[in-house]
Amino acid sequence: MRVRGKRGGFKEASLDISRSTQFLSALLMMAPVLGEDFTIHITSEKKDGSYIRITRKLMEQFGVECNFDGDSYHIKKGQQYQREVYEIEPDVSAACYFYAMAALTGGRTVVKSVHKDSMQGDLRFLEVLEKLGCHVTDTEAGIEVTGTNDGHYPGITVDMNDFSDQTMTLAALAPFADCLLYTSDAA
């Protein structure tokens, strides 16, 4: 990471997010308190991701606008975080373990208050379960996953880039696939 600025505040930063987007989230969240317009130039091929979209969505919900032009993120000065009450979404990462159990056993699982409009990237794990033959429904109570009756699954290839936290959950299902499950970008 390289940060440049004039005396009195930072104005821009350059950042490679190919290995982790956590530094970008941190810079985005601190930008409104700098007192200057702030631009973050992304130097890597990867420019965005599910966790960055979560960060930007939360900033927006707290009254801070962050613009993304495809290469750089721009935060205008003069913005302040404003919110007195905020309802935190259920943890989709943890919910995926229960969804995987339904897939593995051929049973049914509903995790209350988890819905498809969640901003969390791990929700993409449900797309994997659908490819494996599970039935996924967003009910009033929460997302319901029903596994296949026989507990057998086809082999598939999955790009885990936007939900890499679920790599181990998928690995737990892998021994029960009829052929190989391949993952990529799981780091």
Where are these regions (language model features)?
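Short, structured segments at the rim of ligand-binding sites
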Residues: 1-184
